[in-house]
From Swiss-Prot:
PANTHER family: ANKYRIN REPEAT DOMAIN-CONTAINING PROTEIN 60, USHER SYNDROME TYPE-1G PROTEIN-LIKE PROTEIN. It holds the Pfam family Ank_2. The gene is ankrd45. This is Ankyrin repeat domain-containing protein 45. It comes from Danio rerio (Zebrafish). Widely expressed. InterPro entries: ANKRD_45/46/60, Ankyrin_rpt, Ankyrin_rpt-contain_sf, HSP70_C_sf. Keywords: ANK repeat, Cytoplasm, Repeat. GO terms for cellular component: cleavage furrow; cytoplasm; Flemming body; midbody. May play a role during cell division. SUPFAM superfamilies: Ankyrin repeat (SSF48403), Heat shock protein 70kD (HSP70), C-terminal subdomain (SSF100934). One of its GO terms (biological process) is cell population proliferation. ANK repeats lie at residues 46-76, 80-109. Disruption phenotype: Ankrd45 mutants are viable and show no apparent defects. However mutant larvae developed enlarged livers when induced with liver specific expression of Kras G12V, one of the common mutations of KRAS that leads to cancer in humans. It is found in: Cytoplasm; Midbody, Midbody ring; Cleavage furrow.
Length: 224
């Protein structure tokens, strides 16, 4: 039988005891590795560890503390493919969903039914959670595309001989404009983000297409 101290992490999650959790985590990381692992990954009678329990119960501060201190993986999956994001969506814990998204939870994780968290929210009629997840995913997709384009332009080896200065400026300026739009538009909807991403893709398509073309010098060499 485990001692009360070994159960503290899970009990803190269940009781929403943030200060107690901070204390046990501080002590745990000074203990030996085996003991620390036992304390951190303890599960309840139905197999839930502290992170999943906190997500289901809406313990947002507990979730943040566990993940930021490396005591839990925000994208951990159960045997049936449920992530913390799935669990919060299923139980209608909107504030905890927002916390998980801030902590870089994966929108694309699917359970054994092939459902993302947004699908689970819809199945359980947690419509506020479904709406938020659709909005957050659309926003993240736009931000990710902007980051991808910026990374491409910054990669001298990739753009050498394919993009000229004007091409690079188009990419940089267009991405900056979209970033400003994201930061300054407080009432953007999921559809707004989807449309802005499509507009960005359309503007940059002619430039990015050049990256897939063979450099002229290379083509001449091959012909010869």
């Amino acid at each position: 039988m485990r001692s009360a101290e070994e159960k503290t992490v899970l009990l803190c999650a269940l009781d929403d005891d943030l200060e107690g959790l901070k204390g046990i985590l501080e002590r745990t990381f000074t203990d030996d590795a085996a003991q620390s692992e036992n304390i951190l990954w303890e599960k309840d009678e139905v197999g839930r560890n502290a992170l999943f329990a906190a997500c289901m119960m809406g313990r947002s501060a507990i979730v943040r503390e566990l993940v930021q201190n490396g005591a839990a993986d925000v994208n951990e999956l159960t045997a049936r493919g449920y992530s913390p994001l799935h669990c919060s969506a299923m139980w209608g814990q909107l504030d905890t969903l927002k916390t998980l998204v801030e902590l870089n939870a994966d929108f694309q994780a699917i359970n054994f039914r092939g459902e993302k968290a947004v699908d689970v929210a819809r199945r359980y009629d947690k419509l506020d959670c479904a709406e938020y997840l659709a909005w957050a995913e659309a926003k993240q997709n736009l931000q990710a595309f902007i980051q991808e384009v910026r990374a491409i332009v910054a990669d001298q080896e990739k753009v050498q001989g394919k993009l000229n200065k004007e091409d690079k400026n188009i990419c940089i300026n267009t991405c900056s404009a979209k970033s400003d739009w994201i930061n300054n538009t407080r009432t953007a909807t999921a559809q707004d983000f989807i449309e802005q991403k499509k507009l960005l893709e359309d503007v940059l398509a002619p430039v990015l297409l050049k990256l897939n073309a063979q450099p002229e010098a290379s083509m001449k060499t091959r012909k010869n």
